């Protein structure tokens, strides 16, 4: 289960005691979760007004950055196409897997200097992730256009003889070319009707060249045959052929056009290969950047909410729980027993659903302790 609960509780005599109490109740004694300390440095508190406003801003920023993280991860899966099993190993943060990064989280002092105000730090994060989001849109658009154009050409060369491009199938020798009077048509003949074709094609219209039909290709259901006749008999031949379930394809042999199509396909294929490597590298780097930013936002939210709830001086312990999938309900109950004294209005919530005025949270999300979920299930495979 790649879901974490990031919680905080006020320090008792020491923050270490708070941690030991939680660890004993959730991990040591009953294996409800894997627990670890979550290290948040001494950030600048600022004024109460700023903290209240920042609490709302960080909630919005959290949702935005989570969305960007998921978009980058999902686009990585789209780009890797047949290698989706390899996607997870490319989704790293600071070169390690996501679980390791979260459980060993250390604040990045270089990127987000703690001498800056909380608001400034949140603005640095917002600016960086907005840039990633904009870059992703432009890179994805360019790559998707290239991929789409290539797929369109590939589709033309796939499918049945009734619909696919015939340029790759036929040769110059299959046609009478540059004749004032004669023309070669290509006809799709159902295999079940092939004997009828052999018997009838010379008499479907006047002026069909005898013994001019050969099988050029076949698929599961049909043969592709050529036939040569006088140009003025083409319309009549088409009409009679259709009546007998023989389909004349619209095709003119043009070497220049065929060469241009082939060159275009080769160019697109080469361009796609050239762009693939740098794009995957960009996605890896920027997934890491966005994910790191996201976890720093979680740390900011815990800090701000803990100060707002537990007051000053700053005295709380942030802790990370990775719930045992089968014990989620029990874990919630244990946490409730540990911390229900912190907020009398929340004491009944676990048993009795209720709305709390002034809180934009459903009752399932509000607890007497500070709580934020980190869900590392970032991919939705189709």
UniProtKB/Swiss-Prot annotation:
Superkingdom field: Eukaryota
Write down the membrane topology.
Peripheral membrane protein
Q: Which InterPro entries match?
A: ATPase_V1-cplx_csu (IPR004907), Vac_ATP_synth_c_sf (IPR036132)
Q: Which gene encodes it?
A: Atp6v1c1
Q: According to the UniProt record, list the residues that bear N-acetylthreonine.
A: 2
Q: What is this protein called?
A: V-type proton ATPase subunit C 1
What are the GO MF terms of this UniProt record? proton-transporting ATPase activity, rotational mechanism
User: Where does it sit, as one GO cellular component term?
Assistant: proton-transporting V-type ATPase, V1 domain
């Amino acid at each position: 289960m790649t879901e974490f609960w990031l919680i905080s509780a006020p320090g008792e005599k020491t923050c270490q005691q708070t941690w030991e109490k939680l660890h004993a109740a959730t991990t040591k004694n009953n294996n409800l979760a894997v627990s670890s300390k979550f290290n948040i440095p001494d950030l600048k508190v600022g004024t109460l007004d700023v903290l209240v406003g920042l609490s709302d801003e960080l909630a919005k920023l959290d949702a935005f950055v989570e969305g960007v993280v998921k978009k980058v991860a999902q686009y990585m899966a789209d780009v890797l196409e047949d290698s989706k099993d390899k996607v997870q190993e490319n989704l790293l943060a600071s070169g390690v897997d996501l679980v390791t990064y979260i459980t060993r989280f250390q604040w990045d002092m270089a990127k987000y200097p703690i001498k800056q105000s909380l608001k400034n730090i949140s603005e640095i994060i917002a600016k960086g992730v907005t840039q990633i989001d904009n870059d992703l849109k432009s890179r994805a658009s360019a790559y998707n256009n290239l991929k789409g154009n290539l797929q369109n050409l590939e589709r033309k060369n796939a499918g049945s003889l009734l619909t696919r491009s015939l340029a790759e199938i036929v040769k110059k020798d299959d046609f009478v070319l540059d004749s004032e009077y004669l023309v070669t048509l290509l006809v799709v003949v159902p295999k079940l009707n092939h004997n009828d074709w052999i018997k009838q094609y010379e008499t479907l219209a006047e002026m069909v060249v005898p013994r001019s039909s050969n099988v050029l290709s076949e698929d599961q259901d049909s043969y592709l045959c050529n036939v040569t006749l006088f140009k003025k008999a083409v319309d009549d031949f088409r009409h009679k052929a259709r009546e007998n379930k023989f389909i004349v394809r619209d095709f003119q042999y043009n070497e220049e056009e065929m060469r241009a199509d082939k060159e275009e396909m080769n160019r697109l294929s080469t361009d796609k290969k050239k762009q693939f490597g740098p794009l995957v590298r960009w996605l890896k780097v920027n997934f890491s950047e966005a994910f790191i930013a996201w976890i720093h936002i979680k740390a900011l939210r815990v800090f701000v909410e803990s100060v707002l709830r537990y007051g000053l001086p700053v005295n709380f312990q942030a802790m990370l729980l990775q719930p045992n999938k089968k014990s989620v309900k029990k874990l919630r109950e244990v946490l409730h027993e540990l911390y229900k004294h912190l907020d009398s209005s929340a004491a009944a919530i676990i048993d009795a659903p209720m709305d709390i005025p002034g809180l934009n949270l459903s009752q399932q999300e509000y607890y007497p302790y500070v709580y934020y979920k980190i869900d590392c299930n970032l991919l939705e495979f189709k």
